[in-house]
């Protein structure tokens, strides 16, 4: 297929790095290093695995020392591949996966101006260690300092790595947000799901959101470990002690990806966060988009039914029609296999982000392969999706 030529250089909203084994320990305070660190150790079979102290971690237990090539799953995700054919793995120490100057050279070859840079392991460890709150905060700050070392928050105005933020401790979250903002961060990664008994839009967290709004930082709700396997899947009789490789189909459907993302975004809208902070922006990254039309229809319905005939004004804390609030404040990066045209029709080209998920195997082999999914868009809409929306979020 011959793709149309572009009169602009795209900006990718979803690139990843593969972390080295010392991503949490390099800068970890000494008192946490024995027994309270996210680290790599050998299991009984002699294989490397991620552990917290002596306990094997959950979702991302195996280390990603060898990974499948970029786009390796694309035929399978498109319904055309043979699931029994496994591509040959490549080392995660491949220089462009680990080193920012090599990645910039890769961006040049790929025809990409800039990118949001995101973790692979880093989006998975919060839920594993949240019971030890002090250790969670220490490991997360240490991880962010590794990101600052190896990638930077606005490196050469082309690589925009996002730090991790947890809301389990509001005051810590405010302090860490201020620290990374001072170092040039343009946004942060927020784990999907509730904050262990609270909505992320609970007014308790308003000091944090006020600082995020003031600094102009985008909140990226990236696919990750939401905790649903523990408190939702368990109630359906599912084993809560699973890894990425051992999750059941039911767990993938109900506890991972789209479901926690929808719930999180609905909570931000219905719990009134955007009414209290009207300049906040949220980006849903690597959660897909096929669920967006149904969610907006449901938001419109509950905005009418729950408020007018069921629970009164308190049924929703949103002061405007919820589906309109979503369209104003939420940006969505679809999967390549999603119906991107439907998404544009639903929320407008001004809220759709091009994200390649490179170099993950479930993404595209080369970032601009994504053009195959959007090449029929009008020129102005195409530029919005492929460049301008992300440029505005990053303040490029």
Model-derived features with residue positions:
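Mid-to-C-terminal alpha-helical segments outside catalytic/metal-binding sites
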Residues: 2-11, 19-114, 145-153, 175-178, ...
């Amino acid at each position: 297929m011959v793709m149309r030529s572009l009169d602009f250089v795209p900006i990718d909203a979803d690139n990843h790095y593969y972390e080295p084994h010392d991503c949490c320990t390099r800068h970890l305070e000494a008192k946490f290093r024995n027994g309270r660190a996210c680290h790599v150790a050998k299991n009984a079979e002699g294989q490397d695995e991620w552990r917290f102290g002596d306990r094997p971690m959950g979702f991302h237990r195996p280390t990603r020392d060898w990974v499948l090539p970029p786009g390796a799953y694309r035929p399978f995700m498109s319904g055309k591949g043979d699931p029994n054919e496994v591509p040959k793995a490549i080392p995660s120490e491949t220089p462009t996966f680990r080193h920012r100057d090599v990645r910039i050279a890769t961006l040049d070859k790929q025809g990409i101006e800039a990118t949001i840079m995101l973790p692979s392991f880093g989006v998975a460890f919060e839920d594993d260690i949240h019971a030890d709150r002090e250790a969670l905060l220490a490991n997360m700050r240490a991880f962010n300092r590794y990101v600052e070392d190896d990638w930077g928050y606005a490196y050469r105005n082309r690589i925009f790595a996002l730090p991790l933020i947890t809301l389990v401790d509001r005051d810590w979250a405010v302090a860490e947000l201020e620290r990374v903002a001072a170092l040039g961060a343009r946004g942060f990664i927020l784990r999907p799901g509730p904050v262990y008994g609270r909505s992320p839009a609970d007014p308790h967290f308003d000091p944090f959101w006020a600082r995020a709004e003031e600094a102009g930082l985008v909140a990226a709700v990236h696919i990750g470990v939401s905790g649903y396997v523990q408190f939702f899947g368990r109630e359906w009789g599912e084993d809560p002690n699973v890894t990425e490789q051992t999750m059941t189909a039911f767990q993938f459907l109900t506890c991972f990806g789209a479901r926690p993302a929808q719930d999180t975004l609905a909570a931000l809208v219905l719990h009134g966060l955007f009414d209290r902070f009207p300049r906040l922006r949220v980006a849903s990254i690597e959660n897909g988009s096929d669920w967006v039309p149904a969610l907006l229809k449901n938001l419109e319905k509950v905005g009418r039914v729950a408020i007018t005939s069921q629970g009164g004004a308190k049924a929703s804390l949103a002061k405007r029609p919820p589906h309109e609030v979503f369209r104003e404040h939420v940006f969505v990066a679809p999967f390549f296999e999603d119906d991107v045209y439907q998404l544009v029709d639903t929320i407008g080209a001004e809220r759709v982000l091009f994200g390649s998920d490179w170099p993950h195997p479930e993404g595209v082999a080369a970032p601009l392969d994504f053009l195959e999914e959007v090449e029929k868009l009008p020129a102005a809409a195409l530029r919005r999706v492929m460049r301008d929306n992300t440029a505005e979020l990053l303040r490029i």
